Amino acid sequence: MMKQFVQAGLVACLLAAPASAEPLAKELFGAKTTSSNEHAAPHGGYAKGCLAGGAQLPETGPTWQAMRLSRNRNWGHPETVDFIRDLSAYAAKQEGWAGLYIGDISQPRGGPMLTGHRSHQIGLDVDIWMLAPKRLNLSRTERENISSVSMRRAKGAYVNSKWTRQHHNILKAAARDKRVARIFVFPGAKVQMCKDEKGNRAWLRKIRPWWGHHYHFHVRLACPRGANGCVDQAPPPKGDGCADAERWVADILNPPPPDPNAKPPVKRREYVLADLPKQCATTLSR
């Protein structure tokens, strides 16, 4: 009888234990310090994938500096690196801007991160600081300690006095780039750009309101041509999206009452390697 009781208890403990003892994908990818020895390719989606053959954005270039170097997140698909070079060269032509300060792109082999982002996994996302660079010779220590500046007022309903026409121009140039799928920025900035744009408004479709994103804006590139393992996000709805941004602002200023029937949010499960595209196992090993 006692033996049966002990066996039953052991079975119960095993059933209660985690279904898998596999290490988390974020631990595996977060441990890699260099890119894989493969042809450059994004595998999977922006929030569930990896990056083969990633290219490292140089820490300093003619018109940019990569920030927070200790994170080792200045890796991306070569097309992303080229985009940064191009946009920063444009930014350097704006009054008061020496170029761009670049935040997180991806880890050396992409994949889930130990801290921070859910996306930025396939080398096609890049955070660009709102702070206008005055110089591009910051030391490594300065790049760890300096902070960007917030552009928002009233919890993101409006831009503040630090927002300039130069910010508008840089985001517009990014949105007009054919490589770009969408750009995330706080709602008040989108509404302000809608008010200020007097020309062709087609590019505004790519400017998407989202929570946060007032110290930086987040550029997401489309899957490069020929990247068959890459999963694009659905395109933004047709139109300039300005009315939608105004609804975001209205909800910030006058928050709707909570839904009494809303279910509590389900905690997202942490990915293991088997959850990612099968090519990611190869990317980890090379």
Range-by-range predicted roles:
Residues 36-103, 163-172, 177-180:
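Active-site acidic/histidine clusters and adjacent loop/turn architecture
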